[in-house]
Amino acid sequence: MADLSLELCGVKLKNPIIAASGTFGFGREYDELYDIGQLGGISVKGLSLKPRTGNPPSRIAETPSGMLNSVGLQNPGVDSFVENDLPWLLEKNVAVIANITGTSVDEYVQMAERLAPTGVHMLEMNISCPNVHEGGVAFGVKPESVYQITKAVKAAARQPLIVKLTPNVSDITENALAAQEAGADAISMINTLTGIAVDVRRRKMILANNTGGLSGPAVRPVALRMVWQSAQKVHIPIIGMGGIETGEDAAAFMLCGAQAVMVGTANFTDPFACPRIIRELNDYCDAQKVQNVQELVGTLKAY
C-alpha cells in the first residue's frame, strides 16, 4: 500500500481525493452510501451570504462525454450552513472546504469574515461569478481583478485560501500568477467551460439560462494542459480537476503538477466514484512502485 496522505496548505489530508463543490452537496446523501470520512476532503456546495434559489429549469443538459449545468449556485446561505450542516460535517473527520461566491468584493470579504471563527479547514473562492460593479464581467477573467479580490479576501480570511480559476480566458497562467502574488495559499483549476446545448427540432436553447458550464471527461485534456502550464509558473499548490473518473486520471493531474485533485461530475454517474478512485490511485502507485503519492507531482516528461 502506498502512502496517499499529504499536507495541503498546512491541513493534513488522508489522500489527495477531494469531492468537488456543486457535485456533493454537504455530503449527507453520499454518507448514506459510504463513510465520507475516507475522503481527503469535501468542497461543499457554493455558499453565498443570503439563500439563493438558482436559475429556472431546465438547468442541466447531457452532452457527449460530459454535461452542461446552469444551476445558478442554489444554496441555503452561509448562516444555514454554519448552523445546520457544518457541525455534522466536522464530526466526519474529513477536511471541510467552504466554497464561497459573491457579486462584489465586499460580499466575498463578508463571507470570509463569517467563516473565520468556524471550524472550516479551508476556503475555496469561486471567482467565475459576475461582478455587478464591473458590468457583469466575471471576477476571474482579468489578472487585475483576480489580484484585487484575492488580496481583499486573504486579508479577511483566517483559513488557507484556495482561488478557483476559470478556464474561459486566453492565458490561465496570468491569473494563476495574479492569485499567487495576492497571497493565495493554493489555486484550484479548472472551473467549467462555457457552452450551450441546442434542441434542433424546436430550434431552441435547451438551458433556460442559455449558457451553462461544461464538465466531465470532455474537458479533461484542456484541464490537464492548464494545470501543466500553471505548474511551470507558480510555486503554490495546485488542486487539479476536470473530468476525473479513474485513479489513473487523478495520477495524470498529479504528474502535470497538481498536489491534490477534485472529483466532480463522476459523482453523478457513479455515486461511489471518490472511494473507488482512492483505491485505483493506490493500485496505480503500487504498480508503479511509488511509495508516497506526492512522488508523482510534477514528474511528467516531455515526449
Predicted regions and their residues:
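Structural signal for hydrophobic packing residues in well-ordered secondary-structure cores
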Residues: 93, 119, 154-157, 281-289
